Amino acid sequence: MGSDRKIRVVVGGVFDIIHAGHVHFLKMAKELGDELIVIVAHDETVKKRKGRPPINPAEDRAEVLKAIRYVDDVVIGKPGEISLDLIKRLKPDVIALGPDQDFDCEDLKRKLKSIGLNVEVIRLPYLYKKDRAKTSKIIERITEIFCD
């Protein structure tokens, strides 16, 4: 008899202007398990990490993510750095990192192990045209087209 236990995958990110790169990332993350939960970065976290506020507030970013078929649930992260408490509550089997997220996989595994979680941490590769599938590049193109 097989187990009915679902494999839970968790990803996190800003997801400010959803683009094809995000969709490819979410699809690949979903393929790692049965259930995909997205932690969308809190507005304060975006300001701190990117040096600017997000274009869209966290509630709007979460709503857009919920509409993507690969996503089973979305939670808004707490202000500040990655919340180990939130991850502990979500009980992931796998955490999938994006190719441009600046977390060290082994360091994250150690931190998770220190709070009693044995989680597989995987860095996913770029699956789409990285010169186009980056929010910063989209903002640059919008600025070039509409602000000249």
Swiss-Prot record:
Pathway: Cofactor biosynthesis; FAD biosynthesis; FAD from FMN: step 1/1. Its cofactor is a divalent metal cation. Pfam families: CTP_transf_like. ATP binds at V14, F15, H19, A20, G21, H22, D100. The keyword Nucleotide-binding applies. InterPro entries: Archaeal_FAD_synthase (IPR050385), Cyt_trans-like (IPR004821), FAD_synth_RibL (IPR024902), Rossmann-like_a/b/a_fold (IPR014729). The keyword Ribonucleoprotein does not apply. Keywords: ATP-binding, FAD, Flavoprotein, FMN, Nucleotide-binding, Nucleotidyltransferase, Transferase. One of its GO terms (biological process) is FMN metabolic process. GO terms for molecular function: ATP binding; FMN adenylyltransferase activity. Its EC number is 2.7.7.2. It catalyses: FMN + ATP + H(+) = FAD + diphosphate. Homodimer. Catalyzes the transfer of the AMP portion of ATP to flavin mononucleotide (FMN) to produce flavin adenine dinucleotide (FAD) coenzyme. Belongs to the archaeal FAD synthase family. This is FAD synthase. It comes from Pyrococcus horikoshii (strain ATCC 700860 / DSM 12428 / JCM 9974 / NBRC 100139 / OT-3). The gene is ribL.
